[in-house]
């Protein structure tokens, strides 16, 4: 089964070919004007004939009773000489193409059409046309075709055939022999077969409008095949009603809508299967009461030639050469791809070749994800400082406990507008936004502007520490809390102060563990709070806050001042009024220490490879806690117990390892 992409390629070719054979808007407008004008003129001719016939009646026959008014009106309508005009052929089916625009109308008559009636209509029709339009038309009669030929005198040149017909001709043929009543035909009766063909065309038009017009791509394929019949003499005998039947049966029997290319292939498959050949299923005419073969007029040789041509066209279509069937240039691919040339390098030798991309200067970094990530990180570091607190967070820090109220909600359901308000020092501020959160943010911006604080997402840094100035750090983030060392250099408020901080350092896992473990050893029960989280999934920035001795510390990344930040944090943690108490020697109970140390060391040795120990450098410079030995690296690579990698801490008592298999493991063991 062919892929969908090949069908899509066929669809493109078929639609491009269809656009070249479809009539232009000017041609379609000319057709519509000509057909409408002739139809209206024939209506006027019918009225003129009725008035002429009524003028010849006696005066006594014109008196009509009121009770018989409706009945006589219907009889008069049915007794008109010209009953009506209807479209047939290409005009009714919508199958007009360029250079093949045969226009046909059928003029229904009450009686059998005669040459006298034909001449009468032909003589009065130009007069009625002149009353309707200023355009010039040539009107001729064609007795052999039982029709009137009308041609326009300007471009595009169009020809319209009006065929006279009467239902009485078919009614006589359908009567049985016993019921047949010999009626004298007029001596100048028009060709009976031409009239019957016109009536058959009328039935074909009605059938086509009911069955084929609703099928997707059916009309398009018919126009394509009509063009093929005009170009290729082999296909000419199939042109007309048989071609319409084949297309309707081929496309209508599919259980889903077909595209133009697939529908054309399905018709070709149907013809290539041999339905036209003798002994095949044939083609039944659905518009005839008796079983009729619509291909009866074709010879055996013509059927074989069409079948052979359809098989050849099907092979071309299967190999992606449908443009040859349509006689058009191949279209370029809808999805062009980059072609790489095979090149032979001198380094690899003359006999080696590889598929290589052309080298493009300046794009090497884009190919390497690591370089691209570093470049993006550099852009972030060089860009403006990222505000870790928006206006709403800053206002809540300055004035905690503010109550925001929803004043109104307006706008449609898909685009609501919320209006929020807040009362600050007796002044009410209002702002609107597409959501409550956005409206609150807009209110906070207004309040900060009124209070004189910097607003926006990029706040100005009011003061900096001496260490930050020495590092020439140009990109900073504004956060809370001025340092106590800079109170003389910064103007602040006593109650609510905008605190300024720099971005936190980029810490490795070992450095983070060193700070956290040291803080947990010195200050038990510290609580860390997540202030904000920014950045994409590949570049997250977390702002954490911890309170030590009543002073809050915040850290965020990325930055380059790793060593200084760690040093300042450790100095704050291990200095101050509590430093002396921390350095005091603690008395370690001998018995309990021996037991706990033995148990901890034994368990540490049993853990084995694959179970990581405590973080590297976690207890460097810290006093050993009672009851267990601070392991440091403890078990490098997890093979066996070992001394700490950075040396043993001061004042640490070394005890021998003792094993007590029956002694229970204490519940506070750290493993």
Swiss-Prot record:
Biased composition (Basic and acidic residues): 357-371, 466-476
Domain DRBM, first and last residues per copy: 387-453, 504-577
Pfam families per the UniProt record, alphabetical: dsrm, DZF_C, DZF_N
Subcellular location: Cytoplasm
A GO biological-process term: mechanosensory behavior
UniProt modified residues of type Asymmetric dimethylarginine: 611, 616
Chief location of this protein within or outside the cell: cytoplasm
Keyword Repeat carried by entry: yes
Entry function: Involved in spermatogenesis and sperm function. Plays a role in regulation of cell growth. Binds to double-stranded DNA and RNA. Binds most efficiently to poly(I:C) RNA than to poly(dI:dC) DNA. Also binds to single-stranded poly(G) RNA. Binds non-specifically to the mRNA PRM1 3'-UTR and adenovirus VA RNA.
Name of the molecule in the record: Spermatid perinuclear RNA-binding protein
Organism of provenance: Rattus norvegicus (Rat)
Organism lineage string: Eukaryota, Metazoa, Chordata, Craniata, Vertebrata
């Amino acid at each position: 089964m062919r892929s969908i992409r090949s069908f899509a390629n066929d669809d493109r070719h078929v639609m491009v070919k269809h656009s070249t054979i479809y009539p232009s808007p000017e041609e379609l407008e000319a057709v519509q004007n000509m057909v409408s004008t002739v139809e209206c003129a024939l209506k006027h001719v019918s009225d003129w004939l009725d008035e002429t016939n009524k003028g010849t009646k006696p005066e006594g026959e014109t008196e009509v009773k009121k009770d018989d008014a409706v009945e006589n009106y219907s009889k008069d309508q049915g007794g008109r000489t010209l009953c009506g005009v209807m479209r047939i052929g290409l005009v009714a089916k919508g199958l007009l193409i360029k250079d093949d625009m045969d226009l046909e109308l059928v003029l229904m008559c009450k009686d059998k059409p005669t040459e006298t009636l034909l001449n009468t209509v032909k003589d009065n029709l130009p007069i009625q046309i002149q009353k309707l339009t200023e355009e010039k038309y040539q009107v001729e009669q064609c007795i052999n075709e039982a029709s009137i030929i009308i041609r326009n005198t300007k471009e595009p040149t169009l020809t319209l055939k009006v065929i006279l017909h009467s239902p009485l001709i078919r009614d006589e043929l359908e009567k049985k022999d016993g019921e047949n009543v010999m009626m004298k035909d007029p001596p100048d009766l028009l060709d009976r077969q031409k009239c019957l063909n016109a009536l058959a065309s009328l039935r074909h038009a009605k059938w086509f409008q009911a069955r084929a017009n609703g099928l997707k791509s059916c009309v398009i394929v018919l126009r394509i095949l009509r063009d093929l019949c005009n170009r290729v003499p082999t296909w000419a005998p199939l042109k007309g009603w048989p071609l319409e039947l084949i297309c309707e049966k081929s496309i209508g029997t599919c259980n889903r809508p077909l595209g133009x290319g697939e529908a054309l292939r399905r018709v070709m498959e149907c013809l290539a299967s041999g339905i036209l050949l003798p002994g095949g299923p044939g083609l039944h005419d659905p518009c005839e009461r008796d079983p009729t073969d619509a291909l009866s007029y074709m010879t055996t040789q013509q059927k074989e030639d069409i079948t052979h041509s359809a098989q050849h066209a099907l092979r071309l279509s299967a190999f992606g050469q449908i443009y040859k069937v349509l006689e058009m240039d191949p279209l370029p691919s809808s999805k062009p791809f980059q072609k790489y040339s095979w090149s032979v390098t001198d380094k690899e030798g003359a006999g080696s070749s590889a598929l290589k991309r052309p080298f493009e200067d300046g794009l090497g970094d884009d190919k390497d994800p690591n370089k691209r990530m570093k470049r993006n990180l550099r852009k972030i570091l060089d860009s403006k400082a990222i505000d870790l607190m928006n206006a709403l967070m800053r206002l809540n820090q300055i004035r905690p406990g503010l109550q925001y109220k929803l004043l109104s909600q307006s706008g449609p359901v898909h685009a609501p507008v919320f209006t929020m308000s807040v009362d600050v020092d007796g002044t009410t501020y209002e702002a609107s936004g597409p959501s409550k959160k956005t409206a609150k943010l807009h209110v906070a911006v207004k309040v900060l502007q009124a209070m004189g604080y910097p607003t926006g997402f990029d706040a100005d840094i009011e003061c900096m520490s001496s260490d930050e100035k020495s590092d020439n750090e140009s990109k900073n983030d504004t956060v809370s809390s001025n340092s106590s060392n800079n109170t003389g250099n910064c103007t602040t408020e006593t109650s609510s102060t905008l605190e300024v901080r720099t971005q936190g350092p980029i810490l490795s896992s070992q450095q983070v563990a060193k700070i956290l473990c040291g803080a947990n050893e010195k200050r038990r029960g510290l609580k860390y709070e997540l202030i904000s989280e920014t950045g994409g999934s590949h570049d997250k920035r977390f702002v954490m806050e911890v309170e030590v001795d009543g002073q809050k510390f915040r850290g965020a990344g990325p930055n380059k001042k790793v060593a200084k930040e760690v040093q300042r944090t450790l100095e704050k943690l291990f200095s101050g009024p509590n430093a002396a108490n921390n350095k005091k020697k603690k008395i370690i109970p001998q018995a309990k220490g021996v037991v706990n140390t033995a148990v901890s060391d034994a368990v540490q040795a049993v853990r084995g490879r694959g179970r990581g120990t405590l973080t590297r450098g976690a207890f460097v410079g810290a006093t050993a806690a009672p009851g267990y030995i601070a392991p440091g690296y403890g078990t490098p690579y997890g093979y066996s117990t070992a001394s700490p990698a950075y040396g043993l801490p001061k004042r640490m008592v070394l005890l021998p390892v003792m094993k007590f298999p029956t002694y229970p493991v204490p519940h506070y063991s750290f493993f």
